[in-house]
Regions:
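Non-catalytic linker/capping segments at the edges of enzyme domains
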Residues: 1-76, 96, 101, 114-118, ...
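Compact, glycine-rich, soluble single-domain proteins
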Residues: 73-75, 83-91
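Short nucleic-acid-contacting surface segments enriched for D/E, G, S/T with interspersed K/R
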Residues: 82, 117-124
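Short, structured beta-strand/loop micro-motifs enriched in basic residues and often containing a Trp
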Residues: 105-110
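Short tryptophan-centered beta-strand motifs in secreted/extracellular beta-sheet-rich domains
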Residues: 124-130
Length: 180
């Protein structure tokens, strides 16, 4: 995939299938776990820390799979899916700047939920400010981010951590537990 400043859903689906470079590096999840419809802006120099910035969106469709099961007669998008979208985008950033490997969420220092996403909402906006990129021993990103709906910030995540790992094998050798 060519490095550019924005990506369509079609392009993100290619990254989910083939990886950013066509060789499997930095694959995004396939639908329905892909929680991003488009990246409107991705830059390496910018954002609150001048280390990078991502602006992306997900269109809300009233029949998204998660509304049927979370919760019956009280549909709410699970907060963990919004958080996963932030990890997905942070991992995308790592391969976008040239990192190689399979992306794995490593943690988050703090998450606050201040609202909820319902089927009647139209769009989710993700904003990610890259705080730091570490290239050795593991290619890794640290970021702060927010999730917005209807111009209101409803999730805030600080110190998101995603790493790229090479040498991960699936399935792992018999009797072994796969680790990073």
């Amino acid at each position: 995939m060519e490095q550019k400043s924005n990506y369509s859903k079609k392009e993100l689906l290619i990254v989910a299938d083939e990886g950013f470079d066509g060789a499997g590096n930095g694959k995004l999840p396939m639908p329905p776990m892909l929680m991003v419809d488009r990246i409107l802006q991705i830059i390496e120099d910018g954002g609150a820390f001048n280390k990078g910035y991502i602006l992306a969106e997900l269109d809300i469709i009233p029949d998204h799979w998660f509304f049927d099961c979370h919760f019956k007669d009280d549909p709410v998008m699970p907060g963990c899916l919004g958080l996963d979208a932030l990890w997905q985008l942070s991992g995308f950033f790592l391969t976008w700047i040239g990192g190689e490997g399979k992306g794995r969420a490593l943690g988050c220092g703090e998450v606050k939920f201040k609202g909820q996403i319902r089927p009647h909402h139209e769009k989710i906006i993700y904003k990610i400010d890259i705080r730091r990129v570490i290239k050795k021993p593991v290619f890794m990103v640290l970021a702060n981010a927010s999730v917005q709906v209807e111009d209101r910030t409803i999730y805030v995540a600080k110190n998101l951590q995603v790493g790229l790992f090479t040498g991960l094998i699936y399935p792992p050798p018999e009797g072994e537990v796969e680790a990073f």
